[in-house]
Amino acid sequence: MIAIQLPDGSRREFDGPVTVAEVAASIGAGLAKAALAGRIGTGDAARLVDTSHRIEADEALSIITAKDAAGLDVIRHSTAHLLAYAVKELFPDAQVTIGPTIENGFFYDFSYKRPFTPDDLAAIEKKMGDLAAKDEPVVRSVMPRDEAVSYFKSIGEAYKAEIIESIPADQAVSLYAEGKFTDLCRGPHVPSTGKLKFFKLMKVAGAYWRGDHRNEMLQRIYGTAWATKDDLQKYLVMLEEAEKRDHRKLGRELDLFHIDEHAPGVVFWHPKGWTVWQQVEQYMRRVYRDNGYQEVKGPQILDKGLWEKTGHWDKYRDNMFTTESEKRDYALKPMNCPGHILIFKQGIKSYRDLPLRYGEFGQCHRNEPSGGLHGIMRVRGFTQDDGHIFCTEDQILPECDAFTTLLQKVYADFGFTEILYKVATRPEKRIGSDELWDKAEAALIASLRNSGCEFEISPGEGAFYGPKVEYTLKDALGRHWQCGTIQVDFSLPERLDAEYVAESGERLHPVMLHRAILGSLERFIGILIEEHAGALPFWLAPTQVSVLNITDGQADYARDVARSLQKQGLRVALDLRNEKITYKIREHSLQKVPYLIVVGDKERASGAVAVRARGNQDLGVMALEAFSQKLAAELAT
């Protein structure tokens, strides 16, 4: 007898070995039809298997359907294979390489003699639909490694053969076949192609084989797949909205910034964009000042010797911009922490000085691959609201407490109220005692509980030198942006000989808390632009008020109105052009200015202004003083 333990605690017994599909069928016809895979085992030992997997001994089993996150991943992985199947049917000379799942979808890389066209993409998607409609079984088999290499070479799949050759010779490999197509894969996969109904191919892009620019450029076809037609449609609508909000598009239309071929991955800020930058920076500077941070500034270029001590020279050198001068090697800093330790080390520090909080708008450079650059969201030169707290072990909890509370307020001020929290705990390879890790992890978890946060724990995902909390924003489109972090570091102060004098007179290494709220200011501003679709909150808008005259007869009055508002500290544009007022209103509305003031003869005669708010709201005519008070009140909230 074989006993199967189900998630609801019930047990089912079978006379002998049984497949996942057979267990599902024993529960009900509906579950048998919906089953996509199974999860056997519990805890860290649990693993996903095909519905054809035979269970030979007592086991815990969960049936995976499209309602489960794991089920959606199985659908997407299987759809990637369906894509490769369709490509091979239409373009037999194409070679398949790899096809993993990614967020919201999948991709597959192909080697082919010419670029795939939009018409090709449409034909491939249609072929995928035809193959899915045939509802062909997806069959798993196992083959010795060398035999698998020979098989793929025999059918002209050199890339697959190369992948398999990198697997140890004594390991067997699993293959999945659907119709005439066979692919290498760990699995699991859906039981038949008929389970794959709701998908769409999105685009074609270039990708180097194995991510190495010295290798052949392949063609990467991206797609998305979902459990239901409604889910697919919602996702496609979200993508349409995201395209309208694309910060690169809005950056051009609103004249905020540009990226130039002469400096790939570095931002050229235009006057309006730099105004937004300054508002963000000045806000964060007040945050530093009001929360006990001392602002510092370190050099951008530092000697190689420092990076050797920190370990970056060995592990991160390929991502650093380096130079040489007078037979000394230097690097542009990719991060600010070593510089802050050098500042901490100047002069003797006592336990009475701790916690010591440094903050910097630190400009960093990282040599990101050109293919990964994306507007101002993924750049090579960026500025961080980077802070480091030097403290004792007992101060970790109160500092983490204060930081989480502060971060929540900052995000709310920028319009973000949905935050996801994740605690990354100790990895297997780490430094520091278990007692110290216990204290640090407990402090991070307690700080989130004290703030009333729901959070998830990611076991083993902390750095070797300490655990961390990641703070992720959820935007108006439901997308996630990981921005903030607080990272406990037991290592770097010791590596760079940072010490303080304890109450006992003993010299100790401080604990270092790396913390950022916005992360990269460039990226955060990109997120803000997309979150607000370019219509930034009044306090952030590069132009807050535009003053428009109807005819030349009101030009002097319009100047007086603009001057009065500017004296109030507002950012005002004055448009005295000899154009129709409807044209001027439309042009400034497209620039997403929060308030437009129109002045004609009536307004001039009464000392009033006609006010239009963003979104085509007519607020009517009001006294200039009343309008000024309204804006002052809005800024005060």
Curated annotation (Swiss-Prot):
InterPro entries xrefs: aa-tRNA-synt_IIb (IPR002314), aa-tRNA-synth_II (IPR006195), aa-tRNA-synth_II/BPL/LPL (IPR045864), Anticodon-bd (IPR004154), Anticodon-bd_dom_sf (IPR036621), Beta-grasp_dom_sf (IPR012675), TGS (IPR004095), TGS-like (IPR012676)
Cofactor: Zn(2+)
Positions of the TGS domain: 1-65
Record note on cofactor: Binds 1 zinc ion per subunit.
Binding residues for Zn(2+): 337, 388, 514
SMART domains, alphabetized: tRNA_SAD
Top class in the EC scheme: ligase
Catalytic as annotated region, ranges: 246-537
Molecular function GO terms recorded: ATP binding; metal ion binding; threonine-tRNA ligase activity; tRNA binding
Protein name per its UniProtKB record: Threonine--tRNA ligase
